[in-house]
Amino acid sequence: MTTFLQAILFLLASGTVGQSYLTAAAAQSGASSHLDAMKSLYRREPPLPVTNQPLVDLGRDLFFDPLISASGTTACVSCHLPQLGWAVTDPKSRNDSGKLTSRRSQPLTGIGHAGKAPLGWDGRNPTLEAQAKASIATGSMSMSATPTPVKVEIIEERVRANAAYVAKFKAALPDAPINIDTIVLAIAVFERTLEPAVAPFDRWIEGDQAAISESAKRGFELYNGKALCFTCHRGWRFTDDLFHDIGTTSTDRGRGAVVKDDPSMQFAFKTPTLRDVALRPPYMHHGQQATLDEVMRHYEKGGIDRPSRSPLMQPIVLTNEERQDLIAFMETLSGGSGAAVPKR
């Protein structure tokens, strides 16, 4: 259990979670008020530095190219659209064969800032390179119960036979061969540049008081107080990059299928970013909730009571106005179709 989680559980027990957390934040940031303290916790980090622009450009081309799938019809972008925060609105993704997988795709926006956190709903991939390789090698986006192995040599030969790619690999990695490892390296390097577009919330954080509505401002205070949303969806990316069982109806064991000796990880899934969240319903790993209103009501009830359910899942009572204020706030996290796509 992380130190942060231990602290939050203590504050939950004392009934002072929102106030105590923000008092500590104010002391650390030097903020003059609780509101300023809250805002300081969500200020964007600068984009990650690019040290090899030709490699980023190569990765972008590969990300958008169905050439690297077995069928020749599916690309990374098929499940990660830039205008939707690098995700899709399908309740469940389809694999390269067109069959439904067991989960929906996770957004990639801001993924480069996840550091060393395990990736995917169940955290089975330690790096973006590993995730891309698994997607290509199984043709399943790593979400199918019955993946079909793909001969990566076929993909490698296709890329080597493409004169444009040969030239781009030479420019980006002059001394490296063209193989599955350098292909996924380029894709991963590109994915680390996928910064969220500037949203109304960001403009408000930086001082534009008119950027968001009064309802959204009230929602922000609820988010960091009574509603307890910040306990998992915190920081400027609105995720703790951890795994929690939030009590959804599902037979999918999530992280528990990967870390089988940890009872607390049964039915636990990665906390997704809330950046661009209003653009990509439905919600949860299976698309169980159709709207943000349904999501709010799930958290109000506290989810299914079972041994693995996160202790952070505490029933709460929200008025209709408070629920709408929270939704208004989350709608300010969308940057729209201006999602930052690196130039080719």
Indicate residue ranges for each PLM-predicted region.
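Hydrophobic h-region of N-terminal signal peptides that target proteins for export
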Residues: 11-18
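Periplasmic c-type cytochrome electron-transfer domains
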Residues: 6, 21-344
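Bacterial N-terminal signal peptides that target proteins for export
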Residues: 1-8
